[in-house]
């Protein structure tokens, strides 16, 4: 397999920690994931986590409201395994706003328009894994993925920051259980349907 140097944003000390964190989180989730399925990366940024997923799914759909596709293409080995969608993922279709494309946080305020879609609107089949890392928008994104989640019961990695566990609580109400929390960043929860 061809090796590539990963091109991600961050300082010389941050980049190795990010790569270690993505790998650690995916390795925690991997034993629970069914093989030969579709993966979804919500909040894919420049492709660091997606690269960890690359050899484990038949296809991977990646979502980010900031168009970082050029960097993304440099970071994965085989772009034909990916579909890169430039949109935010939320609980309903429409437009919301943020203050800047430089920051990956949808704030529902500001003057930068962000198109929002739901995962359910894509009607993806055989979804076996979803990662949500969208800086506080996880609950809305999961609400917009309800049909997909309830149909396929994918393994879910969800970032939960600053004591906000609403997304985890929603998943638990749907029969999911937390099987682990990454020990690198202590904010990525591995959720598996019981």
Q: What are the roles of these predicted feature ranges?
A:
Residues 1-194:
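Phosphate/nucleotide-binding beta-alpha loop and adjacent structural elements of enzyme active sites
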């Amino acid at each position: 397999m061809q090796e590539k140097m990963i091109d991600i944003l961050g300082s010389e000390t941050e980049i190795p920690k990010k790569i270690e964190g993505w790998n650690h989180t995916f390795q925690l989730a991997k034993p629970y994931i069914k093989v030969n399925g579709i993966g979804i990366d919500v909040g894919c940024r420049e492709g660091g986590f997606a690269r960890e997923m690359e050899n484990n799914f038949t296809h991977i759909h990646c979502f980010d409201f900031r168009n970082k596709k050029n960097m993304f293409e440099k970071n994965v080995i085989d772009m034909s395994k990916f579909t890169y969608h430039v949109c935010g993922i939320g609980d309903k279709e429409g437009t919301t706003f943020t203050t800047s494309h430089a920051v990956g946080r949808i704030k529902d305020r500001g003057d930068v328009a962000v198109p929002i879609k739901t995962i359910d609107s894509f009607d993806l089949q055989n979804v076996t894994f979803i990662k949500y890392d969208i800086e506080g928008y996880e609950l809305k994104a999961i609400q917009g993925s309800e049909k997909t989640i309830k149909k396929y019961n994918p393994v879910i990695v969800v970032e939960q920051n600053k004591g906000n566990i609403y997304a985890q609580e929603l998943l638990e109400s749907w029969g999911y259980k937390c099987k682990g929390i990454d020990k690198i960043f202590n904010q990525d929860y591995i959720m598996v349907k019981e």
